[in-house]
Amino acid sequence: MVGLGIMGAPIVQRLCDKGYDLTVWNLEPDYYDRVKDSGAQWAASPAEVWTASDIVLVCVLGDDAIENVCLGKSGFASAGKAAKLLIDLSTTSPEATLKLASRLKDETGARWLDAPISGGPKPARDGELTVMVGGDSAVFKEAEPLLRKIGQNVTHMGDLGFGQKTKIINQAIVGANYILMAEMLATCRAAGIDPDLLPVCLKGGLADSAILQRIYTQMSAEDFDPPRSYVRQVNKDLKSVTHFVDDLGLDLPLMDVAIRQYHRYADAGNEMEDGASVSRLYQTTDAPK
């Protein structure tokens, strides 16, 4: 595994519990403390992870980061030819996926699956993630037993890049709902409704959702420490949504408004706050415009 962040570390712990021998690397070496007790072995570089492993999982922050671990100094390609399988759990652009998969195959012979994940740290630790996979169907079948150790819902969405396309749509739904939950929390408070009763009342109805039960509840309790996700990550993903939609020639005004609101919160110096803390935008007397 390369990447021991909010999602990478619990995935390592989960796979070690399931009997896998893992070699790991992270840009900040002190992150190894998160998984040391699980039995994972530290490597000095991505190249060392590549050399030591049959399957390499990557869970890093965006296009630049995955390009660096693949093609940068001491990256995977520097380790030379090897018939490896790379599974990219990161949220990256479909364009970067196609470009890097082609380059890495040319330089090392490696196969590639884009398999971005959704669910959060606890589902990652418990093996209950949602995994959306793009790539060759035979390669997917080879990797599926491993992916099902970390995901309760693993779906092959199509060719290489289709996992990332699906994740962009996932993030659009999540990001828009962050704003909707924040606005409905503010509405409950303004109307004198006990905000904690809303998810109880709506449970099982058409308005119920995982986001209502988890994210809205987190917002209502102002339970943002430690972060379960970072504003910078959600904001980055929503920028990807904008590019994706623009490239398709679509006009989605509801999505545009939600994205602008989230950008506004991120740009106010909140990038390292919990992603759900965007509800703080609405803790003023004047609703944001």
What are these regions (language model features)?
Residues 1-59, 84, 90, 121:
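NAD(P)+-binding Rossmann beta1-loop-alpha1 motif at the extreme N-terminus of oxidoreductases
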Residues 6, 10, 48, 55-57, ...:
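Amphipathic alpha-helical hairpins
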Residues 21, 41-42, 85, 111, ...:
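Conserved beta-strand segments of alpha/beta enzyme cores
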Residues 46-111:
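Rossmann-fold NAD(P) dinucleotide-binding segment
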Residues 92-171:
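Rossmann-fold dinucleotide-binding core
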Residues 162-286:
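Helical "substrate-binding/catalytic lid" subdomain
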